[in-house]
Amino acid sequence: MSKKKELLWQSRFSEPFDREALLFSSSVDVDKELYQEDITGSIAHVTMLSEEAIIPAEEARLIIEGLQEIEEEISTGSLVPHWEDEDIHTVIENRLKEKIGPIAGKIHSGRSRNDQVATDTRLYLKRSIEEIRQALKELKTVLVDKAEAYRRTIIFGYTHLQRAQPISAGHYYLAYFNMFDRDNQRLQDLYKRVDISPLGAAAFAGSTLALNAERSRDLLEFEGLFHNSIDAVSDRDIIIEFVSACSIIMMHLSRFAEDLILWSSYEFNYLEISDAFATGSSIMPQKKNADIAELVRGKTGRVYGDLMAMLTIMKGLPLSYNRDMQEDKPPLFDASKTTRSSVRIFTKMLENTSIKENRLSSLVAKDLSLATEIAEYLVQKNMPFRDAHRVTGKIVSHVIESGTTLPDMTLETYRTFSDLFDEDLYDALKPEASVNAKKTHGSTSFASVEEQIVSARTRI
């Protein structure tokens, strides 16, 4: 590649661009990520120019063949973008000029870098959305499989990080399934707004050349076409919406990771994360750290930062295009890659995580989380719920003070709190009975969980 770096816009200026200013403004180290999208967009644009007789067919052929060769050069590493090229668009056009001469300049007929980069970004977003949706599909599949495998395993359900009520482990996994299903729906809905071609808007006011924007749209397989050329190049709301969707996905992963970190700790000891997804300590030999889960939790903050960066970049920009928008690429690329890789590694880790069923079974059977069953037992005996709650609270205090458990407390002792208690109370205090007593829609009963599993499989 030639050592002389030509800036595409420099002819109007009498002094060369300051070298340090060029280094400061160069984005090629970041936007080289878009080289495939940029070449795809250029090939479509040149094809349209040829079909509309704006450039000769033979010149279009040379340009397209040159672009295809450049794509191969970049992908194999034989063409390495340099910061002096300013951006990936300049890298490609300068290399094309080296290959085919001055006719390379016709690639930009009727096109600005404004609609060029807007097109590249939308193509990148379409690909990113599909990749993350595929990763979510794989995660949802594992969640349903886990729900089915553990549908009759009883664990603690928590509120305020306090043991609350016994639930089916399958019910727990399906809760996260539904969260990630909504994440998928958000991306699916966003795709419709991304799938709109901005090519043909030029700088922002359109072009005097007889461009066929509809043909460019079809060649690039966009569903829709921009309505307003200013809007087409000057907003980045689709990036903000995408990074927001990524932030919500990461938030759900982070909450899930927190559960796994806590539940795999010695203090909880409810589940086992495979050694393949844990690390040890360089000084404490006994340690097994849930590092992958912790990293997912930590990377969530990065994606939140990407969202804040995008909102801040755009908040004060007048119409239409401003160079500030160059700074949309780092948060976009980081959010996309971080979210995709986090979903994928979390899926692998979850697939290799197992619940300690025997330990949980013994813990749940004697736990105070069965107290709600006592209150509802009294309600079924026609006691007002507030009174039942008060009576049960006193029973819980007695159990704590006496060191007994709810199932082990005698009927005689129960009757000191209310004469409504009878032998059938002990049936209600069995964890499986507690779980299966739930009658409402979407609840934790085994029958309800099995229905939810069937429904979930249709939504993978």
Swiss-Prot record:
UniProt entry keywords in alphabetical sequence: Amino-acid biosynthesis, Arginine biosynthesis, Cytoplasm, Lyase
Assigned EC number: 4.3.2.1
A GO cellular component entry from the record: cytosol
Enzyme class name: lyase
Pathway(s) it belongs to: Amino-acid biosynthesis; L-arginine biosynthesis; L-arginine from L-ornithine and carbamoyl phosphate: step 3/3
Subcellular localization(s) per the UniProt record: Cytoplasm
Main location: cytoplasm
A biological process from GO: arginine biosynthetic process via ornithine
Keyword Ubl conjugation: no
GO molecular function, a single term: argininosuccinate lyase activity
Domain of life the protein comes from: Bacteria
The reaction(s) this protein catalyses: 2-(N(omega)-L-arginino)succinate = fumarate + L-arginine
Family: Belongs to the lyase 1 family. Argininosuccinate lyase subfamily.
Alphabetical list of PANTHER family matching this protein: ARGININOSUCCINATE LYASE
Protein name: Argininosuccinate lyase
Organism: Prosthecochloris aestuarii (strain DSM 271 / SK 413)
Lineage: Bacteria, Pseudomonadati, Chlorobiota, Chlorobiia, Chlorobiales
Gene behind the chain: argH
